[in-house]
Amino acid sequence: MKEKYLFVPPKPKFTNKVIDKKELKKLMAWAFSNYGTGRASFMADKIKDLGFHYATKAGLSLSVEDLRVPPIKRDLLLQANREIQQTEQLYERGEITTIERFQKVIDTWNNTSEQLKDEVIKYFKQNDPLNPIYIMAFSGARGNISQVRQLVGMRGLMADPQGQIIDLPIKSNFREGLTVTEYLISSYGARKGLVDTALRTADSGYLTRRLVDVAQDIIIREIDCGTQRGIVLRDMVDNNQILVSLKNRLIGRVLFETLYLPNDASVIGHINQDLDHDITNSIIKCGIKSVIVRSPLTCEAPRSVCQFCYGWNLAHGSLVDLGEAVGIIAAQSIGEPGTQLTMRTFHTGGVFTGELAEQIRAPFNGIIRYPKNLKIRIIRTRHGNEGVILDENYKLNILNQRGEKTRLEFKQGTTLFISDNEEFKKGQIIGETKSRSTLVTEKATRDLVTETSGEVIYTNLNIENKIDRQGNSTLITNKGGLLWILKGDVYNIPYNTDIQLKIGDKIAKDTIISTFKTISEYNGIVRLNEKNEEIQILTDFISLENAEIEYNELDVNIECPINLRFEDGKILNLLCVPGNKITNSQVIGEYIEDNYKTTTGGIIKYKNYAELKKEKNKKGYEINDNEVIYWIPEETHEINKDLSLLLIKNNTLINSGTEIIKDVYCLNSGYVEIIQEDEIVKEVIIKPGIIYDSSELNTKRNIGTICDIKEVISTSTENKQIFLDVIGEKLFLRPVESYNIKMSHINLKTKRLTNLEDILNLKVVNRSLYKDGEKIKSVYGLDLVKTYLIVNFNSNKPYASADIEFAPIENSTKYKLNLTITESIQLNYDIFGAINNEDVKTSLVIKDGQRIKKEDLIAETHLVARNKGILKNILISSQSTKKLLIMREEDTFRVPTNNATIQVSRGDLVKYGDQLAGSVIASESGQVFEITKNEIILRKAYPYLVSAGAILQIKDHELVQRNDTLAILVFERSKTGDIVQGLPRIEEILEARKPKEPCKLSQKPGKINTTNSNDETEVIQLIDTDGYTTDYIINNNQKLIISNGENVLLAEPLTDGAPNPHEMLNLYFNFYTSIITLYESAKLSLQKVQTYLVDEVQKVYQSQNVDISDKHIEVIVRQMTSKVKVEDGGDTTLLPGELVELQQIENINEAMMLTKGVPATYCPILLGITKASLNTDSFISAASFQETTRVLTEAAIEGKADWLRGLKENVIIGRLIPAGTGFNAYNEQHKSSKSMKLTGIPDTYYLSSSLEVEDSKLSTIIEDNNLEQYNSIDSFDNIEKENPNN
């Protein structure tokens, strides 16, 4: 550490102030900068001891009693409640919209909370200056004003999880305690805080990683780069507030030029002098507003920054050392406070909050006078009051109570809330200036919902019917007006119901209003269940009379099937139980007989297979009477064991009872066929039959067919059929069993009910489940054909189904089988909607067991009146509903006239507070219904103010229910999407992202002239200095932030929104190229954008009160703006689209000038930090960051070399890093090895091949950059310089 003992340190001054945190900081900074670290830390230790000593002696402690709530709080809350009550009254009179009411409520509570905060401070200062809480918060020891406000003021407004502010404030503080409601609202904010912190930590960490990657190779490598450029520093101002003062920006910088006193030209600071506190103070005292200093942005040291351009190392308060890794320090300085930045702020849903507009308060009690020639526009303020906007700058006269004039200056665009000759009180808000900032507004909508049911009446509404391209029409208000809801009880009635009443009828409670009739769609017999919820109609019925079911509900199980026993003794197994649904052709029962049972497995063949195929369905083939089935027996054993375990051989004859494998025996004699797979025996098949040599038999039949044995063996006398097969080369004759199928004679006696639909039938069928030629693998036998009892439907309904019923037989334990078809009719209790459920009554007009015909009436559902009243309106709309409105007694109110002259007539709409007769005023809003001698009867009504441009959702005289949407109000609010706060905004700037909705930028300097506009767009003209005009089309979703006749600079925003930095860079570059050289215009345009980026990042951090030195941001921005994009390579070897360092391409172009070649053209580009990291010279660094495969592949294809200039590359391959002591080590090594002075040699790597360069000279240029950066491959301008360290 450098201790400064070259001069006598100044003696301490006596600071006659209360030493709080701020003063303590100053004291420590003074000690540190004048006496060095050792003494400063000793002094800090002593101050700490002093503090603890006296805190102990004073017994400073915190108690609940120290939380003093200022008594004025009660009055402030009363005043706020009064204001809100007035707002509510205005809303009830229909003088402000729901949005204006919300905005006013929010602003009222915000202002109250702020006033209370000020009162808390004032109260502590005046009454209890030694209060421990006050001492702690205001000395900077612990806590801040916002926490103190929550403890003893009021907690204020909170936001819900969507970020919308809840208009119910927390009026209590933590000292008084919160109510349950307040506690719940309060917990929203707490949860949001936790979630935000968790997200911030991750985002901030990733930001730091990207910053480190982009700046890691920036090291202080030389003392002075000799640059001819500097940057101008002045106060950083935003919204007329100084964010960072010039004084703070100057400390630790190096002067670019000698600075003289404005009065007597004596020197304040010399060129290349670093600015300490004293010099900075003297600069500020002289009134100098801007100073040119050296900056990393303008440093010309290649791939590094020089000592002078960087300035102080802020940790030491002296010039930065050579070899300091300033890139890493910059990255950490920007990344570390990231966690302190908020992610997103709350938005009010209003136009803009008080912070974005500066309020003008009256300096005294008085009156205002407007001049006659005042150019103003009358507007409606965000609170629904009338205000005026000044179109020019004016000095207006305000008079105090003594008549003395004072002139106040108001800027153009100021909104004034008071009219000509209006009186005002001291401290009253008389106007506000909208801060000229990049405040983006967007059109937002809010539903206007009715708080009561009733009839809609339009008054003063100017409506336009707009039809879009799809032909949909929308009603839009051109001018604001009132929507009245005349109160009444509205009933929604379906279109298919009858209304029993007419308009004007007087109605008692429970009068039937409307009836819905339920009609039968079927003939049949009615069946009702106990609850009468569902009516069933029996449409068909069949009963099996000659069979009985043996059935006991208690012991029904799968093993013991239910039997259906016929009178002739035949038994069917029933395959269904009561409650089952039966579809067409479904099996009900299965007949048990052994006529068609085989003894073993085999192959099945049908005689008339072509006929059977027609009868096939999902449940198998229906077998007709006298059909013949052929059966070729074979015994199949599934083995799945190793071949070595088999006890028999393939194609050998075995007798029945032979052991196949252990404990498995064959049941039949025959030839063996073994089916195996990979030494595993899958199956063993035993086929009975006789083998013949094919030469002995002369058969013309094909293998695999059935034929008479005589056709094959002419000598045979047997009359039987065989199946032709082969074993190896030999013919194998297999026996065939034939089954002649006969229909089972099961007699079905059925009984039906008359006059029902004839749908159901019972039928007995034979079915086989096997295909022709199917091989059935089995050892034991199976049934080839089964006899089934099935149900047949004579109906074309595909979804028809029948129910199974077991009907008990009288005086018996047995049952009869019944099949029924029933249709359900559901009674529609919700026909009048869920809202009317309590007023719906249903009555049945049928009985259980009654026979009914199609279109007979089954039930009537009545909607009855909830209250007595008068039927005022019946509305039949096209949307399949009818509505009617009943005016009840509670929907009217009476006002006695006290014999005064009546000032209203029947049908008039009266607002709350309006005069009715003499001094009689309306206690509620309403419509005059009837006027008698002594009183006026009014029907309650509610006026709603609808602003211009609103979309109406209902028509005039329509009937609405409570909570129906009347209109969609369109309003402007500050855009939350684009005022991205905190971390996301920092990321957006540093990644050089294009904003979603960028503002329009002026393409040249000039004067603005606003011209014609229509609904969709506005056209403005920019007249430049040469008189040329440029037209800009502004969409209606963008707002102009400049006024007519205003002068604008190049790339200045014309509309609201964030500028696109890429567009800004292009505008500057295109403008400068027409005036100066390509290199200079690239430098200048980049410098403009650099300044913008630095300021933008600072604004975000300053808004959260985080101080970061400019130089850190400048180091990062330098890396983002160091490259250009080649447009045309000229005679160089550069390719179009290639990204090259600006300095490097300029060196190449200079070399081209010497060889009279065509230089390359290029344009500057702005890279985001991620892109800049990936485009770094070192592929090792880029690959270790992101997209490893792509980076390494491209580097390999291009044959890139990594010069190991940065820290990261050296760390990765395990070398000493070229920073700190490593920097000096490499320097020493370089000094000893450097024996010859390098001469200026052009860079052949980039020049065209026509230029010849000696290899020996080139090899001396391409040295390890860790030795010294002057010999880098593309630093021509420094090649002739001596190393300043030599």
Curated annotation (Swiss-Prot):
Keywords: Chloroplast, DNA-directed RNA polymerase, Metal-binding, Nucleotidyltransferase, Plastid, Transcription, Transferase, Zinc. InterPro entries: DNA-dir_RpoC2_beta_pp (IPR012756), DNA-dir_RpoC_beta_prime (IPR045867), RNA_pol_Rpb1_3 (IPR007066), RNA_pol_Rpb1_3_sf (IPR042102), RNA_pol_Rpb1_4 (IPR007083), RNA_pol_Rpb1_5 (IPR007081), Rpb1_funnel_sf (IPR038120). Its cofactor is Zn(2+). GO terms for molecular function: DNA binding; DNA-directed RNA polymerase activity; zinc ion binding. Its main location: plastid. Zn(2+) binds at C225, C299, C306, C309. Pfam families: RNA_pol_Rpb1_3, RNA_pol_Rpb1_4, RNA_pol_Rpb1_5. It catalyses: RNA(n) + a ribonucleoside 5'-triphosphate = RNA(n+1) + diphosphate. The keyword Methyltransferase does not apply. Binds 1 Zn(2+) ion per subunit. One of its GO terms (biological process) is DNA-templated transcription. SUPFAM superfamilies: beta and beta-prime subunits of DNA dependent RNA-polymerase. It is found in: Plastid, Chloroplast. GO terms for cellular component: chloroplast; DNA-directed RNA polymerase complex; mitochondrion. Its EC number is 2.7.7.6. It comes from the Eukaryota. Gene3D superfamilies: 1.10.132.30, 1.10.150.390, 1.10.1790.20, 2.40.50.100, RNA polymerase Rpb1, domain 3. The keyword Nucleus does not apply. DNA-dependent RNA polymerase catalyzes the transcription of DNA into RNA using the four ribonucleoside triphosphates as substrates. Belongs to the RNA polymerase beta' chain family. RpoC2 subfamily. HAMAP family: RNApol_bact_RpoC2 (MF_01324). In plastids the minimal PEP RNA polymerase catalytic core is composed of four subunits: alpha, beta, beta', and beta''. When a (nuclear-encoded) sigma factor is associated with the core the holoenzyme is formed, which can initiate transcription. This is DNA-directed RNA polymerase subunit beta''.
